[in-house]
Amino acid sequence: VKLVSGDMHYPHGDPPGLTDEKDAMLICQAVPTTDLVIEARLLERAAEIEPRIMPCKVHSHEPLAHDVMRVMLKLPESQRLQFLAGQYLEFLLENGKRRAFSIANAPHDDEFIELHIRHVEGGTFTDFVFDSLKDRTVLRIEAPLGTFTLREESDRPMLFIAGGTGFAPIKGMLEHAFFSGISRPMTLYWGVRSRRDLYLPDLPEEWMAENDNFRFIPVLSEPDADWSGRTGFVHDAVLRDIGNISEYDVYMAGPPIMVTSASEAFEEHGLSRDYMFSDAFEYAAPRGK
């Protein structure tokens, strides 16, 4: 978003990959020091869903990779979470802090809330998730939040670009698109460091087998010796494949440096910012920082 007036700061330092655009800010990390006026592109449907603070219970948790945990949350029996694919929730912690995670399931599949939580060494909350979390633990959340959602009224082909656990909101978006019968061409590029970081490798392959309009292209930045697929930066792989990226709707989720680099590269190749939609997130700083 753009900061129009007021003052704020980033308590953990400027986020990596923060755009150089004048007065740009990441509202998920900024702490206001005065009243703020901001400019943001809002989606009407997302604005119509009022976020709620509610309890939830950990139904199950399982490791998907060496540093990714899938956590399934269950709301009270009488409640269901109304949300749009791609939105996120925040855990309300006892120390007053919050931790945000994207919702990985689609709205039609709402028996549980699925999260993919990456372990950050020294991060208080993720240490708790990986070392101490037990099923049936009761937590408090606020949801749904965010405007990173599908523009279903568009007729343009779609590119989905995920970095690491940025796959989570993209998963929800794609499962919603398949369920809704969207027939536009859809391509997912999933950029990770090594093969083991593709923490649900079979799922996109299943999507390809079931949907003729979907393609999946994994990209490794530090490939294994036996890797024969794509390598390098994920946005470079996209630009090598796509002849005219200006014709696409592009959805990006992952670390700010990835989203910023991709956005700048795509704009240089003719894609208007009006057709770029992103969820850039940074992992919480370790204790003491």
Across the structure, where does each feature detected by a protein language model lie?
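Short, surface-exposed secondary-structure boundary micro-motifs
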Residues: 4, 41-43, 94, 144
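Reductase modules of NAD(P)H-dependent flavoproteins
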Residues: 1-36, 185-289
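Phosphate- and divalent-cation-binding pockets in alpha/beta enzyme and binding domains
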Residues: 149, 169-172, 199, 261-262
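Ferredoxin-reductase
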Residues: 50-138, 155-156, 192-194, 219-223
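A short, basic/flexible loop-to-alpha-helix module at the beginning of a structural domain
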Residues: 143-155
